[in-house]
Swiss-Prot record:
SUPFAM superfamilies named among the record's database cross-references: N-terminal domain of the delta subunit of the F1F0-ATP synthase
InterPro entries: ATP_synth_OSCP/delta_N_sf, ATPase_OSCP/d_CS, ATPase_OSCP/dsu
Compartments in which it is found: Cell inner membrane
NCBIfam families in UniProt: ATP_synt_delta
Taxonomic superkingdom: Bacteria
Main location: membrane
Annotated organism of origin: Thermodesulfovibrio yellowstonii (strain ATCC 51303 / DSM 11347 / YP87)
Coiled coil: none
The name this protein goes by in its record: ATP synthase subunit delta
Keyword RNA-binding attributed: no
Similarity comment: family membership: Belongs to the ATPase delta chain family.
Record GO biological process: proton motive force-driven ATP synthesis
Keywords: ATP synthesis, Cell inner membrane, Cell membrane, CF(1), Hydrogen ion transport, Ion transport, Membrane, Transport
């Protein structure tokens, strides 16, 4: 089995997106992430899908059963079988990350994570979404997390950009300024 990274993973992701209905991608990605998680946690399952000691027919059978149980479309089953036969199914996690990134790009969306010390009220969540939409020029999908160590305020990560408006972050900046003199 060969690892799949970078341009090769992106190529497979583009192939996948050309096979499926773009509106089904979020649901399919969610189910593929389940497969990736199983491959990471269950060594026997991973070996069955990736080891050359198992015949292609055996792997195709397992993939077919898995796709049926997860309710994955026929195109996805064919794609997983293709990856298995190519010997690159071990790189499914990286491929799924590219599928998700290319989907968001095609839909002109970005994903972000908002971390706060306490649960945020809906009106604040809406203001954050509107502000990020104005900054990025794209629709924003946010995931919310709670981290009491922030003390107050929020930390927002969108793509590779971090906006730290937390008290903890501001205290860190103040500390750095005091140290530098």
């Amino acid at each position: 089995m060969r690892k799949v990274r970078g341009a090769k993973a992106k190529k497979y992701a583009k192939q996948f997106l050309s096979l499926v209905n773009i509106d089904q991608v979020p649901e399919i990605v969610s189910k593929l992430e389940t497969v990736v998680m199983l491959m990471q946690k269950e060594k026997q399952f991973r070996n069955m899908l990736t080891s050359p000691s198992f015949k292609d027919e055996e792997r195709v059978g397992v993939i077919g059963y898995l796709c049926e149980k997860l309710g994955l479309p026929e195109e996805t089953k064919k794609f997983l079988n293709f990856l298995s036969i190519e010997g690159v199914l071990i790189g499914l996690g990286e491929i799924v990350r590219y599928i998700n990134a290319l989907y968001l790009e095609a839909k002109k969306k970005v994903k972000g994570i908002v971390t706060s010390a306490v649960e945020l009220p809906e009106n604040i969540k809406q203001k954050i979404v509107e502000s990020l939409k104005a900054i990025t020029g794209r629709d924003v999908e946010l995931q919310y997390e709670i981290d009491p160590s922030l003390i107050g305020g929020v930390r927002v990560k969108v793509g590779s950009t971090m906006y730290d408006l937390s008290i903890k972050g501001q205290l860190g900046l103040l500390r750095d300024k005091l140290i530098k003199g």
